[in-house]
Amino acid sequence: MANVLDELLDRGYIKQFTHEEETRKLLENEKVTFYIGFDPTADSLHVGHFIAMMFMAHMQRAGHRPIALLGGGTAMVGDPSGKTDMRKMLTKEQIQHNVDSIKKQMERFIDFSDDKALIVNNADWLLDLNYVDFLREVGVHFSVNRMLSAECFKQRLEKGLSFLEFNYMLMQGYDFYVLNQKYGCKMELGGDDQWSNMIAGVELVRRKAQGDAMAMTCTLLTNSQGQKMGKTVGGALWLDADKVSPFDFYQYWRNVDDADVEKCLALLTFLPMDEVRRLGALEGAEINGAKKILAFEVTKLVHGEEEAKKAEEAANALFSGGADMSNVPTVTIAKEDLGSTVLDIIAKTKIVPSKKEGRRLIEQGGLSINGEKIIDLTRTLNEDDFEDGSALIKRGKKNYNKIEIQ
């Protein structure tokens, strides 16, 4: 069996190991069952999760078995890692809705047929735990002194860390133990912000089960300045087409900085690394060709080849006049809406996520209709704006929508 570790290292996925040599030997000699956890705090995954799923997909293609662990139980507590304040508490119903939505998205990326991968929910074992038994069986293996020194708790101690959240590390560690016992899971993969929690899980399995347990962290998706990627004018870059249209998703990758093209191709596509390096080395106008390939490949993986082609054609239509404009994301309004302010209409049709965001966009000169920059918040949308049957809205530099009258 080929060792996928070399491929993962070459592509830049891996940030840290708990046991590097043991991990290499295990991946060389066994079909390894591993897991990545996803807390269902929203009803869609975003691009930060996508890099983790690509990590899983590379492992699966090399013959290993992924478990996608949905945190229906841990979401009841909330992960304090990387947060300065306590997360908003979700109801059981909200969490279950999110779990169901995320399951559907995951099936686009990972092959769950014939036991090749599993989706499990930690609510199945966490919600019925006896607290005293849990403390005796699991809590005894955790040192409070060590927990307090963990990076995920440090930044919260001054602001206040609830006892509810303090339990999160124990619960995540217990997840690994349950998966180890039930499915023979020997490895956890996760974002680098989960390092402290992952170490806790590895140590718990090694102490309690006396077996192999190890962890690898995946690099976070950051740009060349070290800032997290995946933020848009409307917020997170969601993988749900109802939250971020395939066209806007395509445009995000089409417009990444030149310095980030090679990294994104390596982490977010299956293109061979020789091709990734060739594309990443292009300069000047040629790098735009590499960006188009990046945008198409990532959109194809997330939304399917048909939607990727539509997004590509729409972009060509807008920027070179060479294709069908029908693929530009389109919203409709009633004739009675004519005469309303542009601000009201773009908020009502969800072209912008909120009226506040629309106001900010107009005040900063980032909105135009049919090429006319909108600078007046009271500017109305009128029949004259629909001379060609539709009005073309431009947000920022390269985000477009069409408005049509029903």
Curated annotation (Swiss-Prot):
Residue numbers covered by motif 'KMSKS' region: 228-232
PANTHER family cross-referenced by the UniProt entry: TYROSINE--TRNA LIGASE, MITOCHONDRIAL, TYROSYL-TRNA SYNTHETASE
Function comment: Catalyzes the attachment of tyrosine to tRNA(Tyr) in a two-step reaction: tyrosine is first activated by ATP to form Tyr-AMP and then transferred to the acceptor end of tRNA(Tyr).
Family stated for the protein in its record: Belongs to the class-I aminoacyl-tRNA synthetase family. TyrS type 1 subfamily.
One Gene Ontology term from the biological process aspect of the record: tyrosyl-tRNA aminoacylation
Binding site for L-tyrosine: 35, 168, 172
Stored PROSITE patterns: AA_TRNA_LIGASE_I (PS00178), S4 (PS50889)
Residues the record lists as binding ATP: 231
Any single GO CC term annotated in Swiss-Prot or TrEMBL for this entry: cytosol
UniProt keywords, alphabetically: Aminoacyl-tRNA synthetase, ATP-binding, Cytoplasm, Ligase, Nucleotide-binding, Protein biosynthesis, RNA-binding
GO MF term (any one): ATP binding
Compartments in which it is found: Cytoplasm
Catalyzed reactions: tRNA(Tyr) + L-tyrosine + ATP = L-tyrosyl-tRNA(Tyr) + AMP + diphosphate + H(+)
Enzyme Commission number(s): 6.1.1.1
Residue ranges constituting the S4 RNA-binding domain according to the UniProt record: 340-404
Subunit (UniProt): Homodimer.
Name the UniProt record assigns to this protein: Tyrosine--tRNA ligase
Residue positions of motif 'HIGH' region: 40-49
The organism of origin for this protein: Clostridium botulinum (strain Alaska E43 / Type E3)
Domain of life: Bacteria
